[in-house]
Amino acid sequence: MMKSVVAVLTGILLALGVGALSIFGIAAPFFTYFFGPELASTALPAVFVLFAAAFAFYFGGMVASYKAPSRRRLHGVLVGVGAFVISPLVNLVAPDPTVRGGDPFANLRTPEAFLFTTVLLVLVLTVSYVGALRGETLFAHNQAVIRRQKTRKARERLSEGKD
């Protein structure tokens, strides 16, 4: 059970790290250069946010799937689910009183924001699943390589013993 939790949390942390790196390390300098520092910090286009989330959660799902003890696809998808569960919980536990009277979901009150969040959720779950498939494939391949190496070493030891 603990390995499962660690696998999913590792995937979530990797996804958050890659997402932050792609937004603040790649996209932010681009927007700062072309649009100036005032506009770049507040008007990051949604397309780039969706791309960064897709890029990040693909790798997060892959890592969780690879590290999982069993049910690899499930662990990969749980990275996306976990991120979308943790975020509202943090908003409920620590609401910001300066944002619309302390409403933890103030940013979801408009239809556009709700639509964007729904698209983001579907994208994250889909990409996490694709990453989980890739992690499962990598794990199976690496296990096959390890088995072949062990078999070859065992044959070499047997052939050395006969000489």
List the predicted regions and their residue ranges.
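Juxtamembrane/disordered regions of integral membrane proteins
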Residues: 1-163
